[in-house]
Curated annotation (Swiss-Prot):
This is Phosphoribosylformylglycinamidine synthase subunit PurL. Part of the phosphoribosylformylglycinamidine synthase complex involved in the purines biosynthetic pathway. Catalyzes the ATP-dependent conversion of formylglycinamide ribonucleotide (FGAR) and glutamine to yield formylglycinamidine ribonucleotide (FGAM) and glutamate. The FGAM synthase complex is composed of three subunits. PurQ produces an ammonia molecule by converting glutamine to glutamate. PurL transfers the ammonia molecule to FGAR to form FGAM in an ATP-dependent manner. It catalyses: N(2)-formyl-N(1)-(5-phospho-beta-D-ribosyl)glycinamide + L-glutamine + ATP + H2O = 2-formamido-N(1)-(5-O-phospho-beta-D-ribosyl)acetamidine + L-glutamate + ADP + phosphate + H(+). SUPFAM superfamilies: PurM C-terminal domain-like, PurM N-terminal domain-like. Pathway: Purine metabolism; IMP biosynthesis via de novo pathway; 5-amino-1-(5-phospho-D-ribosyl)imidazole from N(2)-formyl-N(1)-(5-phospho-D-ribosyl)glycinamide: step 1/2. The lineage of its organism: Bacteria, Pseudomonadati, Campylobacterota, Epsilonproteobacteria, Nautiliales. It comes from Nitratiruptor sp. (strain SB155-2).
Amino acid sequence: MENIEEILKAHKLTMEDYEHIKKILGREPNLVEIGIFSAMWSEHCSYKSSKKYLKGFPTEAPWVIQGPGENAGVIDIGDGMAAVFKMESHNHPSFIEPYQGAATGVGGILRDVFTMGARPVANLNALRFGDVKREDEVGAHQRYLVRGVVAGIGGYGNCVGVPTIGGEVSFDECYNGNILVNAFSLGICKKDEIFYGRAEGVGNPVIYVGSKTGRDGLGGAVMSSDSFTEETKKLRPTVQVGDPFTEKLLLEACLELFKTDYVVGIQDMGAAGLTSSSFEMAGRAGSGMKMYLDKVPMREEGMTPYELMLSESQERMLICAKKGTEEKVLEIFRKWDLDAEIIGEVTDTGVMELYWHGEKVAEVPVAPVSEEAPELDRPTKRPEYLAYIKETSIDTVPHVEDQEAFEKLLGSLEVVNKAWVYEQYDSMVQTNTVKHPGTLDASVIRVKENGKAIAMSSKCNPRYCYIDPKGGAAAAVMAAGRNVAMSGARPLAITDCLNYGNPENPEVMWQFAQGTEGIKEACRALNTPVVSGNVSLYNETNGVSVYPTPTIAMVGLNDDANKVVPSYFQETNDVVYIIGDTEKEFGGSLYLKELFGKVAGELPKIDYEKELRLWNFVIEANNRGLLKAAKDVGVGGIAIALAKMAALGNKGFLGNFCFEDSREIFSETFSRALVEIDPKNMHALEELANEIGIHATPLGTVGGNRFQLCDIDMEMEKLKDIYFNTFKREIERDL
């Protein structure tokens, strides 16, 4: 093949890779085969840099039905029902083309869930943007990205009819060159009706269903495995274009198919399209496959085998059906006005054979491309900045009056209400959503089949992960679990989306290795196994990587959907308690960031026993009918958590407690919660706290038209204006 070096460079392959490919094939590869190896060995598909670190994740528990390795994780939720869930990134496409990038991220994660046999019932998203407050082009571009991404998520999810019920939105200048768009979906099915991505049974037909294949998304998997430069805008053709109405038809057709016994295996065509779906299905089953690419439904004229194998056109699935049922399968999809064609069959050769009008155009062994793809052991190095980052503390910065600090923190885009975002999403479609977004610490969906509730929350504080990559990742697991527990549910399992910079940088690889250690440690200690997840590397532009951002989505179960705990003030004269101990801990805090522009200090102490005691306390207090409301104490500390409860409940607060150093109301000590109770239940609450071994301290009472805590005194009207209106004012100021 001529110009081999240029071809390899275009496919992000090295000469070493090329020699390896020749050894596997026993000959020189052709262009189609190079395209296949390039996509399947990309970071995006093969996890070659990260796989060695993921192997130690705890993945088993009595309630885990399916752990990592399939399209999504599955847990038992009782009464013969299962919850299916996963989180994925669509970072690179969303930065290049925000609307379609975010929309197709939603589409892809929905397919991961319904390909397992589950009807999707809830979506979350975790979004990270750059500095939208800047007055220059960078700030304007970030505001454009926010508007585009949110519109894309809403546009797709709303049309498919799956509620988007929560998530998180945060901002930091480290995301100016790479935004992060992490999408989560959860579905429900019967636990004995789960489908897997396997192609087995010699002679069984391989069927293509869904949209026609076009040239959109060509090279998307390879693009997502590289860092950005100034040339990035030229990559728009590598971003897929979504059609949510077709997705809805595909969803319903698949669910109808699952009621039959025709299916051997099914796989969504995601990154690397037909290549990944076919190789993954054959790889999991240890089988081979013959595919006739001229049978693939095409949207454009003149498409080549190379393009058909690597296109990332959306809303497509690959099905392995039982021999003899193919016409019935085709009939179901055509009834839903979808393309459906038999394009191949399963073999026992362990080889993928591709044909084009009768001519063989590729012949590749399955295992070396999929299950046995190369793994890298990249060098790691502790970042130099960690040597001096702990020198900063609350005692090394100037004193700021509590009132001034409170107003600044309350107006932080990390804190203020995100109604502008979630009001663009249909959160109530399907009528299973227990409460509106923003009114609970977790997002909660009712399981109509058994009267239970599934709670879910996504969390990560990138500042914590920057100052302590291991502890910050563990803290994300704790925080996601804490949110779930605050709603009254028992945390059960996580899915993750591990967003990091360039793995070719040893310091980034060290951050990643430490992050996975933190997740392993926390999940073991808290008994919340990892059941699915995603790794997104190369989140870097012009040599600048994002902060380590291991987003954790925790899923939990509440046995009674009528016992879900809100997170805002309910009734005047109720008493508010702080549960847990407060220390003077400001490492990575919002206080240091907003008031002094510093991301530094020592991470608050991690104590898994305290965390578990807090979860047990809140869950038991709720079961005993003691709680009116519960709120996790997170960024901004007690002051900000109380302010959110007051604003959302439209009730003031009169504090009658303060710390010796009043700044501790902004401390971010872990494993704490605020609870609101009826005064008559004070004794019962304190008895339960003693029983569990956790401190419960009364802070004050609900009511009035002012917010008063230590030296803070603010009219509720002003507090509500800052909390509810700041986000919209900031994001829409260009319009």
